[in-house]
Curated annotation (Swiss-Prot):
Keyword terms of this UniProt record: ATP-binding, Cytoplasm, Cytoskeleton, Hydrolase, Nucleotide-binding
GO CC terms in record: actin cytoskeleton; cytoplasm
Function in brief: Actins are highly conserved proteins that are involved in various types of cell motility and are ubiquitously expressed in all eukaryotic cells. Multiple isoforms are involved in various cellular functions such as cytoskeleton structure, cell mobility, chromosome movement and muscle contraction.
Name of the protein in its database record: Putative actin-24
Organism: Dictyostelium discoideum (Social amoeba)
PROSITE patterns according to UniProt: ACTINS_1, ACTINS_2, ACTINS_ACT_LIKE
GO MF terms, alphabetically ordered: ATP binding; hydrolase activity; myosin binding; structural constituent of cytoskeleton
Signal peptide: none
InterPro entries, sorted: Actin (IPR004000), Actin/actin-like_CS (IPR020902), Actin_CS (IPR004001), ATPase_NBD (IPR043129)
Keyword DNA repair among record annotations: no
EC number(s) given by UniProt: 3.6.4.-
One annotated GO biological process: phagocytosis
Reactions that this protein is recorded to catalyse: ATP + H2O = ADP + phosphate + H(+)
Gene behind the chain: act24
């Protein structure tokens, strides 16, 4: 079916943030926390225009009187009723559109279950009455955003990290690796480091947001972890100050690079996983040997937890040590990679060649939810 590109809605549902906007734009219009909050005690907020539920930033700001739910856990939608609320909020409050008037492109994690894949078109067509929809894998969209059809994507967000080899637009499920280590774990680790090393105690949800901000503003990846530890021990040159909301200043030293080091050494979090350099290498090694050269030459970083300064140089160093000496390693770290899955969706939905790939309402009514397996791959 033919769809007006400029009115197509693109929604990237992450564990931490929901990114939403219109195809053809180079950035999402709305980015808000993937949170649904409900009053702990009905009646507490009567007279304050109490609502049954609060979404995103509003839920975050009222967190002291709400029970917060996170419908996307480790990248996977686990609570469909709450997810429906987030989508409703996205359409009517954030984008201010009627979903029955716009095609919708949704993102999904690699290796998404059959049942989860079918639930998305079911809700879009039966609840929101959209005229057309499509489901695309986040990592593949990130690759499209970089103008490539071949590469291995290291996608690390708030809840989960994946390494996904793609060749000429095709994924290889057996070579995809999934790592239950991402931004949320790093924020928790930074909390622990600040407490054990510096005596700063951040316990409430509001204080967790402060730790997240410290991580995002001050953390970086060391090229050589042991050497950086020695530098930090012998001089204050790596220390940075951070101003807390109450005006107090705190000083942060080696925690700045010890926190994201866990991506390369999950054992720091007592996790028995390979680091992101090893999962990337392992994913490539599981692919046909003829693809290796193109994959090593196109290692793409995507997602908010790849935004640490120094991560690309460190990945290059670690992969060079693992790969055959004849292989040329190239790490691609686009500046807008925090939103690259959304940007890829925006590009894909705008292509005239993509238009026949939409699942139309008529096709859904005829075939049911299983049509998603036939049309979205």
């Amino acid at each position: 079916m033919e769809c007006k590109e400029d009115l197509t809605i693109v929604i990237d549902n992450g564990s931490g943030m929901c990114k939403a906007g219109f195809a053809g734009y180079d950035a999402p219009h709305a980015v808000f926390p993937s949170i649904v909050g409900r009053p702990r005690h009905t009646g507490v907020m009567v007279g304050m225009g109490q609502k049954d539920s609060y979404i995103g930033d509003e839920a975050q700001s009222k967190r002291d009187i709400l029970n917060l739910k996170f419908p996307v856990e480790r990248g996977i939608i686990t609570n469909w009723n709450d997810m429906e609320e987030i989508w409703h909020h996205t359409f009517y409050n954030e984008l201010r559109v009627a979903p029955e008037e716009h095609p919708v492109l949704l993102t999904e994690p690699p290796l998404n279950s059959k049942a989860n894949r079918e639930k998305m078109p079911q809700i879009m067509f039966e609840t929101f009455n959209t005229p057309a929809m499509y489901v695309a894998i986040q990592a593949v969209l990130s690759l499209y955003a970089s103008g490539r059809a071949t590469g291995v994507i290291l996608d690390s967000g708030d809840g989960v990290s994946y390494t996904v080899p793609v060749y000429e637009g095709n994924t290889f499920p057996l070579s995809i690796t999934r790592l239950h280590l991402a931004g949320g774990d790093l924020t928790d680790y930074m909390s622990r480091l600040l407490y054990t090393d510096c005596g700063y105690y951040f316990s409430t949800k509001a204080e967790k947001e402060i730790v997240k901000d410290i991580k995002e503003k001050l953390a970086y990846v060391a090229l050589d972890f042991e050497a950086e530890m020695q530098t930090a021990a012998s001089s204050p040159s790596l220390e940075k100050s951070y101003k807390l909301p109450d005006g107090r200043m705190i000083t942060i030293g080696n925690e700045r690079f010890r926190c994201p080091e866990a991506l390369f050494q999950p054992s720091l979090l007592a996790m028995d996983y390979d680091g992101i350099h090893e999962t990337t290498y392992n994913s490539i090694m599981k692919c046909d040997v003829d693809f290796h050269k193109d994959l090593y030459g196109n290692v793409l970083l995507s997602g908010g937890s790849t935004m640490f300064p120094g991560i690309a140089d460190r990945m290059n160093k670690e992969l060079t040590a693992l790969a055959p000496s004849t292989m040329k390693i190239k790490i691609i770290a686009p500046p807008e990679r925090k939103y690259s899955a959304w940007i890829g969706g925006s590009i894909l939905a705008s292509l005239s060649s993509f238009q026949p790939r939409w699942i139309s309402k008529e096709e859904y009514d005829e075939s049911g939810p299983s049509i998603v397996h036939r049309k979205c791959w």
